């Protein structure tokens, strides 16, 4: 049997993959929302699964609102630069380095935090893009204190991890959940019982036990009144998902922000 391999330059592989994805979507007569399309296509590109064209659902303006939150560090940097500029004009060269440090601190303190439920998802998020926005990623799953508390209480580490993340104040929190449905269930509880107001929830855990139900809990937030009903989310309905899907959704959000390079 003769197998013919196509020669393609490395830099062109992703572009051609996306073109093939669009061809298949056209063949299936699937029309995606223009804003949501890059997110859906990246999920398909990551998984080779066209079901995401049907089962990936978005709350109203979820993409734009999450991108705005991811840009919080840029907004903080601009404000700090303006403030630092006035100080450095008076302080001279010695004041300039102090102003630079203040700017960096402002970005770090203002930037969004993407919280994942696996180190795999965290590792898959573009470090360059996150850093360019003054944002950061965190995963509490391997924290010894989280593991110890989870054992003592008889709950999953994902539950305790969400509680730890919810303690972070005054910074936009975007939760990217690709593995543990208990993380979504706990987020739902924290939203109702502890006043947690995430800047976004990416709910794409994969599996069988309580996976569908946990996702439906997040979808049900849209039925509530503000402010709970205003929490933006992106959810993969059904059993499909995974840490790779959670990471690729975050990356698709990042890559759609002006001036963000991979």
Predicted regions and their residues:
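Electropositive, gly/pro-rich neighborhoods at or near active sites that engage anionic ligands
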Residues: 1-74, 106-108, 112-113
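Intrinsically disordered, low-complexity terminal tails and inter-domain linkers enriched
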Residues: 71-110, 224-228
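Buried hydrophobic positions in well-ordered alpha/beta secondary-structure cores of metabolic enzymes
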Residues: 117, 202-203, 249
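Short glycine/serine/threonine-rich phosphate/pyrophosphate-binding segments
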Residues: 121-124, 181-187, 208-212, 242-246
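Long, charge-dense
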Residues: 129-170
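Glycine-rich phosphate-binding loops that contact phosphosugars or nucleotide phosphates
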Residues: 157-158, 166-169, 174-194, 209, ...
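C-terminal functional extensions of proteins
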Residues: 199, 209-262
């Amino acid at each position: 049997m003769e197998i013919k391999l196509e020669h393609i330059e490395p830099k062109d592989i992703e572009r051609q993959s996306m073109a093939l994805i669009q061809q298949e979507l056209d063949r299936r007569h699937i029309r995606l929302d223009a804003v949501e399309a890059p997110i859906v296509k990246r999920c398909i590109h990551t998984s080779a699964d066209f079901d995401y064209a049907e089962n990936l659902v978005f709350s109203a303006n979820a993409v734009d609102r999450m991108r705005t939150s991811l840009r919080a560090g840029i907004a903080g940097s601009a404000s700090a630069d303006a403030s630092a500029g006035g100080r450095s004009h008076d302080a001279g060269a010695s004041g300039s380095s102090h102003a630079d440090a203040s700017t960096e601190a402002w970005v770090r303190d203002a930037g969004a935090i993407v919280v994942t439920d696996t180190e795999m998802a965290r590792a898959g998020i573009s470090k360059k893009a996150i850093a360019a926005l003054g944002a950061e990623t965190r995963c509490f799953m391997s924290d010894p204190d989280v593991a110890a508390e989870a054992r003592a209480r008889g709950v999953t580490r994902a539950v305790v991890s969400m509680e730890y993340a919810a303690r972070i104040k005054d910074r936009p929190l975007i939760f990217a959940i690709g593995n543990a449905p208990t993380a979504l269930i706990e987020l739902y509880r924290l939203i109702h019982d502890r006043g947690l107001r995430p800047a976004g929830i990416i709910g794409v855990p994969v599996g069988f036990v309580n996976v569908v139900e946990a996702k439906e809990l997040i979808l049900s937030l849209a039925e509530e009144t503000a402010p709970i009903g205003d929490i933006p989310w992106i959810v993969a309905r059904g059993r499909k998902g995974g840490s790779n899907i959670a990471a690729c959704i975050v990356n698709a959000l990042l890559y759609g922000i002006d001036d963000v390079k991979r």
